[in-house]
Every structure is written in C-alpha cells, then in structure tokens.
C-alpha cells in the first residue's frame, strides 16, 4: 500500500497514539516503513545566555526520555521492528511533520486525534494543524 508512513506521536500520551497504531500497520502492510515522530517544544526563546547550559541539559534529558518511550512504543506494533524508525525533534509538530515528510518522500501521515472539544473544533490542535499545512495525505484516527 504505502512505502513511507509518518506517525506523529506524543510519547507522554500513549493512549492517543495507540489508536493510530493498527491503522499505520495496515497501511504499511507488506513492506512499508513507519516513522514514529515525537516532537518536543523548541526552547529557542528560553535560551537565555546564563541558562543556556541548563536548558541544553534539560533538552537532552527530554530527548533521551522520549527516545526510550518511542522504543517502548515499538512493542505495540505487530510488524517487524526493523520496519519502524524513530525520530525525536524539537519545534512545532506541524513544521516537523512536513519537514520529515519532505526529507523521506513520505506517502501519508497517520495521526491520532483527541475527542472533540469546543477549542479544537472536532480535531486535536496538532492533528488540525498538520492537516491544514500538510503537502501529503493525512489519515486522522479517533
């Protein structure tokens, strides 16, 4: 079906991502590769000179924690783990999804969405933003 699938995940809210796992696997079927992407907020505005070292250490800690949780998430899939790649980036979900999609020549994005609320108008804010700015098909899973 699809060769390259990007699946943005929040490793600190696994139940949201769990919904999308089976759909991503189905789309990957025979030989597709799923790229799990966790995006941490960028801290450029927090990088005051006298706190830069502390901010850097904190970012490294967050990145390490996210990488460990992504590794745990791989066990939720039934496909061969060699077909699941992991990415941790800093920035906005929307921008990082589009950047990774362009780098990889991705075919589709599979993203979980929260339950409806007034503030997000039926989609989670990340899912909504990804849909509005994506240059490729996006499958939203509830």
From Swiss-Prot:
Listed A to Z, the keywords are: Phosphoprotein, Stress response
Q: Which GO terms describe its molecular function?
A: adenylate kinase activity; AMPylase activity; protein homodimerization activity; protein kinase activity
Which GO terms fall under biological process for this protein?
regulation of bacterial-type flagellum-dependent cell motility; response to stress
Instruction: Spell out the SUPFAM superfamilies in the cross-references.
Output: Adenine nucleotide alpha hydrolases-like
Give a short account of its post-translational modification: Upon overproduction 2 forms are seen in exponential phase and 3 in stationary phase. Isoform 1 is the most abundant form in exponential phase, isoforms 1 and 2 are equivalent in stationary phase and greater than isoform 3. Isoform 3 is stationary-phase specific and autophosphorylated. Isoforms 2 and 3 are more acidic than isoform 1.
The induction annotation reads: By starvation, heat shock and in response to some toxic agents.
Report the superkingdom from the record: Bacteria
Q: Which GO terms describe its cellular component?
A: cytoplasm
Gene3D superfamilies reported for this sequence? HUPs
Q: What happens when the gene is disrupted?
A: Recovers slowly from late stationary phase growth, increased sensitivity to carbonyl cyanide m-chlorophenyl hydrazone, a proton ionophore and respiratory chain uncoupler.
Q: What does this protein do?
A: Has intrinsic autoadenylation and autophosphorylation activities, probably on Ser or Thr residues.
Question: What's the subunit arrangement here?
Answer: Interacts with GroEL. Forms homodimers, mediated by the C-terminus of the protein.
What family does this belong to?
A: Belongs to the universal stress protein A family.
State what protein this is by name.
Answer: Universal stress protein UP12
What is the native source organism of this protein? Escherichia coli (strain K12)
